[in-house]
Amino acid sequence: MSEFVTVARPYAKAAFDFAVEHQSVERWQDMLAFAAEVTKNEQMAELLSGALAPETLAESFIAVCGEQLDENGQNLIRVMAENNRLNALPDVLEQFIHLRAASEATSEVEVTSATALSEEQLSKISAAMEKRLSRKVKLNCKIDKSVMAGVIIRAGDMVIDGSVRGRLERLADVLQS
């Protein structure tokens, strides 16, 4: 986990509460995602680690973001710059997404397979995970040829490894012991 998670949580909570109150959760997530990407820019990273005055840093950051940030998003940037916390924006986004998922009773489920899965397979996985987790799921599919065949499903700290690679690794462990 990133060192900024504890720092990011109150900012994410404040942004999320504000977004819910103003029915703009999607817009806020988009603004935070854009601002988080800006912090990853090499030149911006140098500015963030430099000795600029917080007001100058905030205005420079806001200028780079342009119209991607509304007035309230700009205010968040100013507050975070004032407290030297702009580096925590990627973690603020991550915490915001977790808060949104919790409020919408959804879970992000990562499905890794060797080949693209059919719509039927994805709907079966989705239904099974919704039943198991007792909430709606959003599938994020990845293709990894090293899986060989089968799938690996990750939801939070739960991992279901139904891949050939996983079976071979478990077999190798048994044979070595």
From Swiss-Prot:
Bilayer topology: Peripheral membrane protein
Gene: atpH
MF annotations from Gene Ontology: proton-transporting ATP synthase activity, rotational mechanism
Compartments it resides in: Cell inner membrane
Primary location recorded for the protein, binned into one broad class: membrane
GO cellular component: plasma membrane; proton-transporting ATP synthase complex
Protein family according to the UniProt entry: Belongs to the ATPase delta chain family.
Record protein name field: ATP synthase subunit delta
One Pfam family linked to the record: OSCP
InterPro entries hit by this protein: ATP_synth_OSCP/delta_N_sf, ATPase_OSCP/d_CS, ATPase_OSCP/dsu
